[in-house]
């Protein structure tokens, strides 16, 4: 293992951000694919919030946080057949010697949460 990250957010916080900032908020945080998926759901705000939490958790697991090394939209969360899929720049994964990122996401009526684990190729880390 290299790192673990977790995050929890109130779904209403994402709802308020969207109603305040609209597409500007969406386009800063989420890829077009993420937006399309979330707005195809009956509760898009829960889907957006769980992806927001997942991006935070992934950035913490990698040890970079969101900022200069890793931008919001460089992390893409998509639906896999059995579990969520995480895409981040290959160059960053190579630099950190990360071979894969495991992700678990969940939400209820009020909160969304995610846990990410980054596995390294070199067991000495």
Swiss-Prot record:
Its cofactor is Mg(2+). One of its GO terms (cellular component) is cytoplasm. This is Holo-[acyl-carrier-protein] synthase. Keywords: Cytoplasm, Fatty acid biosynthesis, Fatty acid metabolism, Lipid biosynthesis, Lipid metabolism, Magnesium, Metal-binding, Transferase. It catalyses: apo-[ACP] + CoA = holo-[ACP] + adenosine 3',5'-bisphosphate + H(+). Its EC number is 2.7.8.7. Belongs to the P-Pant transferase superfamily. AcpS family. Coiled coil: none annotated. Pfam families: ACPS. It is an enzyme of class 2 (transferase). It is found in: Cytoplasm. GO terms for biological process: fatty acid biosynthetic process. Transfers the 4'-phosphopantetheine moiety from coenzyme A to a Ser of acyl-carrier-protein. One of its GO terms (molecular function) is magnesium ion binding. The gene is acpS. Signal peptide: none annotated. Its main location: cytoplasm. Mg(2+) binds at residues 7, 56.
